[in-house]
Amino acid sequence: PVYGGIVLSMERFKRIIEIDERNFQAVVEPGVITQVFQEECEKRGLYYPPDPASRGSSHLGGNLAECSGGPRAVKYGVTKDYVLGLEAVLPTGEVINTGGRVLKNVSGYNLTQLIIGSEGTLAVITKIIFRLVPLPRVKKVLLVAFNALEDAVAAVASIFQRGITPSA
């Protein structure tokens, strides 16, 4: 850490408290490994799209602190797009709950989104409520070689113009 700073490990906060298949939501602690969470969701036909390159070792709380994304962000968005609410501890020691288990929450300031991406400077996240989506029924991998960068750019533009949004 920077001189005078501290390192706070949340790795023991690693419970997946609930995966609610009916409402497409999950409640987790910040020390859950991203890939472990994704696999548990997929066992239930649900999908948590954010896929940072470090998903095999990154913790969900760290993903929120940085608002991580990954290649699938093109289609699905980044971490902040899947957070419905938080439990967090402020520097004063006060425990707060932000957001909630509803898809549209418009009461007051959006403290959830303020904390996401703040890299731990505003609060320590202790619980996360995620929105999930249905697991895609079909996944196809396509690898295409181009002779020139301009051809690749034109192909990508053509794909988007046809209304197709690739996941990466």
Tell what function each PLM region has.
Residues 1-13, 28, 49:
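Glycine-rich N-terminal segment of FAD-binding domains in flavoprotein oxidoreductases
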Residues 15-167:
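FAD-binding subdomain of flavoenzyme oxidoreductases
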